[in-house]
Amino acid sequence: HRGRMEIRVDVKGISCHGSAPERGDNAIYKMADILQNIRSLNENGDGPSNEIKGLVKMLNPEFNPVHAEDAQFLGRGTCTVSQIFYTSPSRCAVADSCAISVDRRMTAGETWDFCLKEIEALPAVQKYKDDVKVSMYMYDRPSWTGEVYETECFFPTWINKESAAHVQALADAHKALWGEARIGHADADPKYDAMHLRNRPLIDKWTFSTNCVSIQGRYGIPCVGFGTGAESQAHAPNEITWKQDLLT
Protein backbone atom coordinates (compact mmCIF):
# COMPACT_ATOMS: atom_id res chain seq x y z
CA HIS A 1 0.00 0.00 0.00
CA ARG A 2 0.92 3.65 -0.09
CA GLY A 3 3.57 5.07 2.17
CA ARG A 4 3.10 7.94 4.55
CA MET A 5 4.91 10.78 6.28
CA GLU A 6 4.07 13.49 8.81
CA ILE A 7 4.92 17.06 7.82
CA ARG A 8 4.96 20.19 9.99
CA VAL A 9 4.63 23.74 8.67
CA ASP A 10 5.57 26.62 11.01
CA VAL A 11 4.78 30.27 10.33
CA LYS A 12 6.17 33.24 12.28
CA GLY A 13 4.37 36.52 12.85
CA ILE A 14 4.63 39.57 15.11
CA SER A 15 2.25 40.10 18.00
CA CYS A 16 0.66 43.36 19.05
CA HIS A 17 -2.42 44.55 20.91
CA GLY A 18 -5.64 43.33 19.32
CA SER A 19 -7.07 46.86 19.27
CA ALA A 20 -4.54 47.85 16.57
CA PRO A 21 -3.83 44.68 14.57
CA GLU A 22 -2.17 46.64 11.77
CA ARG A 23 0.85 47.10 14.05
CA GLY A 24 1.51 43.36 14.03
CA ASP A 25 1.82 40.53 11.55
CA ASN A 26 -0.82 37.87 12.11
CA ALA A 27 0.66 34.38 11.69
CA ILE A 28 -2.79 32.80 11.49
CA TYR A 29 -3.69 34.91 8.45
CA LYS A 30 -0.50 33.77 6.72
CA MET A 31 -1.29 30.17 7.56
CA ALA A 32 -4.81 30.62 6.16
CA ASP A 33 -3.29 31.22 2.72
CA ILE A 34 -1.07 28.17 3.07
CA LEU A 35 -4.03 26.03 4.14
CA GLN A 36 -5.87 26.88 0.94
CA ASN A 37 -2.80 25.92 -1.10
CA ILE A 38 -2.52 22.56 0.67
CA ARG A 39 -6.20 21.92 0.01
CA SER A 40 -5.64 22.73 -3.66
CA LEU A 41 -2.64 20.40 -3.76
CA ASN A 42 -4.90 17.56 -2.66
CA GLU A 43 -7.95 18.42 -4.77
CA ASN A 44 -6.67 20.00 -8.01
CA GLY A 45 -6.16 18.26 -11.33
CA ASP A 46 -2.87 18.30 -13.22
CA GLY A 47 -3.98 20.32 -16.26
CA PRO A 48 -2.25 23.43 -17.60
CA SER A 49 -4.88 25.69 -16.04
CA ASN A 50 -3.91 24.60 -12.52
CA GLU A 51 -1.26 26.84 -10.97
CA ILE A 52 -0.93 24.23 -8.24
CA LYS A 53 -0.78 20.79 -9.84
CA GLY A 54 -2.76 18.33 -7.75
CA LEU A 55 -1.34 15.12 -6.32
CA VAL A 56 -3.25 13.21 -8.99
CA LYS A 57 -0.40 14.20 -11.33
CA MET A 58 1.62 11.20 -10.16
CA LEU A 59 -0.80 8.90 -11.99
CA ASN A 60 0.26 10.60 -15.22
CA PRO A 61 3.39 9.21 -16.94
CA GLU A 62 4.25 12.79 -17.93
CA PHE A 63 4.96 13.61 -14.27
CA ASN A 64 5.87 10.12 -13.05
CA PRO A 65 7.45 8.28 -16.00
CA VAL A 66 9.06 5.44 -14.04
CA HIS A 67 6.37 4.60 -11.46
CA ALA A 68 3.07 5.69 -13.03
CA GLU A 69 1.81 2.13 -13.53
CA ASP A 70 2.34 1.22 -9.86
CA ALA A 71 0.84 4.57 -8.82
CA GLN A 72 -2.28 3.87 -10.88
CA PHE A 73 -2.71 0.59 -8.98
CA LEU A 74 -2.04 2.03 -5.53
CA GLY A 75 -3.96 5.25 -6.13
CA ARG A 76 -2.82 8.84 -5.96
CA GLY A 77 -1.16 10.38 -2.95
CA THR A 78 -3.19 12.53 -0.58
CA CYS A 79 -2.56 15.25 1.97
CA THR A 80 -4.76 16.63 4.71
CA VAL A 81 -4.23 19.03 7.60
CA SER A 82 -4.67 17.02 10.78
CA GLN A 83 -3.68 19.49 13.53
CA ILE A 84 -3.29 23.24 13.99
CA PHE A 85 -1.47 25.15 16.76
CA TYR A 86 -0.87 28.82 17.56
CA THR A 87 0.76 31.10 20.10
CA SER A 88 -0.57 34.46 21.21
CA PRO A 89 -0.07 36.46 24.40
CA SER A 90 -3.83 36.51 24.98
CA ARG A 91 -7.24 36.43 23.32
CA CYS A 92 -6.80 40.18 22.87
CA ALA A 93 -3.57 40.04 20.89
CA VAL A 94 -2.37 39.19 17.38
CA ALA A 95 -1.02 35.64 17.03
CA ASP A 96 2.76 35.55 16.64
CA SER A 97 3.04 31.94 15.42
CA CYS A 98 0.95 29.25 13.81
CA ALA A 99 1.78 25.66 12.93
CA ILE A 100 0.02 22.75 11.28
CA SER A 101 0.53 19.01 10.94
CA VAL A 102 -0.02 17.50 7.50
CA ASP A 103 -0.79 13.80 7.03
CA ARG A 104 0.77 12.95 3.67
CA ARG A 105 0.04 9.61 2.00
CA MET A 106 2.50 8.77 -0.76
CA THR A 107 2.10 6.75 -3.92
CA ALA A 108 4.79 5.10 -6.02
CA GLY A 109 7.42 7.57 -7.19
CA GLU A 110 7.10 9.96 -4.22
CA THR A 111 9.84 10.34 -1.59
CA TRP A 112 9.98 12.33 1.64
CA ASP A 113 12.27 14.89 0.03
CA PHE A 114 9.90 15.23 -2.94
CA CYS A 115 6.94 15.83 -0.60
CA LEU A 116 8.73 18.47 1.48
CA LYS A 117 9.85 20.36 -1.63
CA GLU A 118 6.29 20.19 -2.98
CA ILE A 119 5.02 22.06 0.10
CA GLU A 120 7.92 24.52 -0.02
CA ALA A 121 7.04 25.34 -3.64
CA LEU A 122 3.43 26.32 -2.89
CA PRO A 123 2.70 29.96 -3.83
CA ALA A 124 1.71 31.00 -0.31
CA VAL A 125 4.80 29.37 1.20
CA GLN A 126 6.95 31.23 -1.32
CA LYS A 127 5.09 34.46 -0.55
CA TYR A 128 5.95 34.23 3.16
CA LYS A 129 9.16 32.31 2.57
CA ASP A 130 11.33 34.02 5.20
CA ASP A 131 8.74 33.30 7.89
CA VAL A 132 7.89 29.70 6.95
CA LYS A 133 9.60 26.45 7.91
CA VAL A 134 8.59 23.11 6.38
CA SER A 135 9.92 20.02 8.15
CA MET A 136 9.35 16.35 8.81
CA TYR A 137 8.31 15.19 12.26
CA MET A 138 10.59 12.84 14.18
CA TYR A 139 9.50 10.01 16.47
CA ASP A 140 11.37 10.44 19.74
CA ARG A 141 9.04 8.89 22.31
CA PRO A 142 10.87 6.82 24.95
CA SER A 143 10.37 3.05 24.83
CA TRP A 144 9.30 1.05 27.88
CA THR A 145 12.98 0.84 28.88
CA GLY A 146 13.38 4.61 28.59
CA GLU A 147 15.53 4.28 25.48
CA VAL A 148 14.91 6.96 22.83
CA TYR A 149 15.57 5.87 19.24
CA GLU A 150 14.86 8.90 17.09
CA THR A 151 13.28 7.95 13.76
CA GLU A 152 11.94 9.98 10.87
CA CYS A 153 8.14 10.05 10.53
CA PHE A 154 8.45 8.65 7.03
CA PHE A 155 7.53 5.18 5.84
CA PRO A 156 7.98 4.30 2.16
CA THR A 157 5.42 3.01 -0.28
CA TRP A 158 5.69 -0.72 -0.92
CA ILE A 159 4.17 -3.06 -3.47
CA ASN A 160 4.31 -6.76 -4.34
CA LYS A 161 3.53 -8.47 -7.60
CA GLU A 162 0.55 -10.80 -7.36
CA SER A 163 2.87 -13.56 -8.57
CA ALA A 164 5.26 -13.09 -5.60
CA ALA A 165 5.89 -16.38 -3.78
CA HIS A 166 4.73 -15.19 -0.36
CA VAL A 167 1.54 -13.68 -1.83
CA GLN A 168 0.68 -16.89 -3.65
CA ALA A 169 1.49 -18.99 -0.56
CA LEU A 170 -1.16 -17.13 1.44
CA ALA A 171 -3.66 -17.26 -1.42
CA ASP A 172 -3.13 -21.02 -1.81
CA ALA A 173 -3.54 -21.59 1.94
CA HIS A 174 -6.77 -19.57 1.95
CA LYS A 175 -8.21 -21.56 -0.97
CA ALA A 176 -7.19 -24.86 0.65
CA LEU A 177 -9.00 -23.96 3.86
CA TRP A 178 -12.11 -22.21 2.58
CA GLY A 179 -12.30 -22.54 -1.18
CA GLU A 180 -12.77 -19.59 -3.51
CA ALA A 181 -16.39 -18.59 -2.82
CA ARG A 182 -17.34 -15.77 -0.51
CA ILE A 183 -18.81 -17.02 2.76
CA GLY A 184 -22.43 -15.84 2.99
CA HIS A 185 -24.06 -12.89 1.26
CA ALA A 186 -25.03 -14.90 -1.83
CA ASP A 187 -28.13 -12.72 -2.21
CA ALA A 188 -26.24 -9.43 -1.90
CA ASP A 189 -27.40 -6.54 -4.07
CA PRO A 190 -24.49 -5.98 -6.51
CA LYS A 191 -25.39 -2.30 -6.82
CA TYR A 192 -24.56 -1.69 -3.16
CA ASP A 193 -22.59 -4.75 -2.12
CA ALA A 194 -20.49 -5.80 -5.12
CA MET A 195 -17.47 -6.67 -2.98
CA HIS A 196 -19.46 -9.45 -1.31
CA LEU A 197 -19.97 -11.17 -4.67
CA ARG A 198 -16.29 -11.34 -5.57
CA ASN A 199 -14.38 -14.56 -5.16
CA ARG A 200 -11.91 -14.94 -2.35
CA PRO A 201 -9.17 -14.41 -1.58
CA LEU A 202 -9.30 -10.91 -3.02
CA ILE A 203 -5.74 -9.80 -3.82
CA ASP A 204 -5.69 -6.02 -3.94
CA LYS A 205 -4.22 -2.96 -2.23
CA TRP A 206 -5.25 -1.02 0.86
CA THR A 207 -5.88 2.72 0.92
CA PHE A 208 -4.82 3.00 4.56
CA SER A 209 -1.42 2.24 6.07
CA THR A 210 -0.18 -0.60 8.29
CA ASN A 211 3.09 -1.57 9.96
CA CYS A 212 4.15 -3.04 6.61
CA VAL A 213 5.33 0.43 5.59
CA SER A 214 8.12 -0.14 8.10
CA ILE A 215 8.64 -3.90 7.72
CA GLN A 216 8.74 -3.97 3.91
CA GLY A 217 8.77 -0.31 2.93
CA ARG A 218 11.68 0.68 5.16
CA TYR A 219 13.49 -2.61 5.80
CA GLY A 220 12.66 -4.62 2.67
CA ILE A 221 11.28 -7.67 4.52
CA PRO A 222 8.54 -9.23 2.34
CA CYS A 223 5.07 -8.62 3.76
CA VAL A 224 1.46 -9.34 3.00
CA GLY A 225 -1.60 -7.96 4.77
CA PHE A 226 -4.47 -10.32 5.56
CA GLY A 227 -7.73 -9.72 7.34
CA THR A 228 -11.50 -9.63 7.37
CA GLY A 229 -13.95 -6.81 6.93
CA ALA A 230 -14.07 -3.69 4.81
CA GLU A 231 -11.37 -1.03 4.91
CA SER A 232 -14.04 1.69 4.80
CA GLN A 233 -14.74 0.76 8.42
CA ALA A 234 -11.19 1.47 9.63
CA HIS A 235 -11.22 4.25 12.27
CA ALA A 236 -14.86 4.96 11.40
CA PRO A 237 -17.48 5.89 14.01
CA ASN A 238 -19.20 2.70 15.21
CA GLU A 239 -16.68 0.56 13.34
CA ILE A 240 -18.01 -2.93 12.57
CA THR A 241 -17.04 -6.25 11.02
CA TRP A 242 -19.76 -8.27 9.34
CA LYS A 243 -20.66 -11.66 10.81
CA GLN A 244 -20.36 -13.16 7.34
CA ASP A 245 -16.65 -12.35 7.41
CA LEU A 246 -16.06 -14.40 10.55
CA LEU A 247 -15.73 -18.15 10.96
CA THR A 248 -17.89 -19.47 13.78
Predicted regions and their residues:
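Metal-dependent amide/peptide-bond hydrolase catalytic core
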Residues: 2-247
